[in-house]
Amino acid sequence: MENLLAMPVRPIEVMIAKIVPYIAIGYVQVVLTMAISSAAFDLPVRGSLFLLIVALGLFIASNLALGFTFSTIASSQMQAMQMAQFTLLPSILLSGFMFPFYGMPKWAQWTGEIFPTTHALRVVRGILLKGNGAAEILPELWPIAAFTLVVGAIAIWAYRETLD
């Protein structure tokens, strides 16, 4: 980090440089998961794989922006990991992944709508199982994009140019 701080770069440039490799890793995970799911479980793919990859890229970016935000506001690596764990479990439990979304209490549904995981699951299910196109998934993409922009802006704003 000391080398980055010594360079004449803006916080947004540091953020992009740190996030881009992880986006590539996220795409590798998506491709491997899709390949294994198709081969081992005969997962149907009724929609556009290209559309799925683009939509999941936004989801990957939203999670990386959240992680970057945690790392900028945390005072230690341990604190950043605890923040990540604190949001991981609710995002999975309230997304509709483990329990039917509309079977949850209203407060849980409202809370679940905040997390990008909820919308990403709807996109994945829509594209893979229903063959949804761009028009059908757009209502699920804008909340992910808004989350990414807000959380990314917080990360840039909170970025410290010193090591404290």
Positions of PLM-derived features:
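Short cytosolic juxtamembrane segments of multi-pass membrane proteins
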Residues: 157-164
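Membrane-interfacial helix-loop-helix junctions in multi-pass membrane proteins
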Residues: 44, 96-150
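Hydrophobic alpha-helical interface/terminus motif in multipass membrane transporters
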Residues: 1-4, 36, 40, 70, ...
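Alpha-helical transmembrane segments and their short interhelical loops
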Residues: 11, 15-85, 89, 135-141, ...
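Hydrophobic transmembrane alpha-helices
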Residues: 23, 53-61, 83-101, 108-117, ...
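Positions in alpha-helical segments
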Residues: 2, 68, 106-109
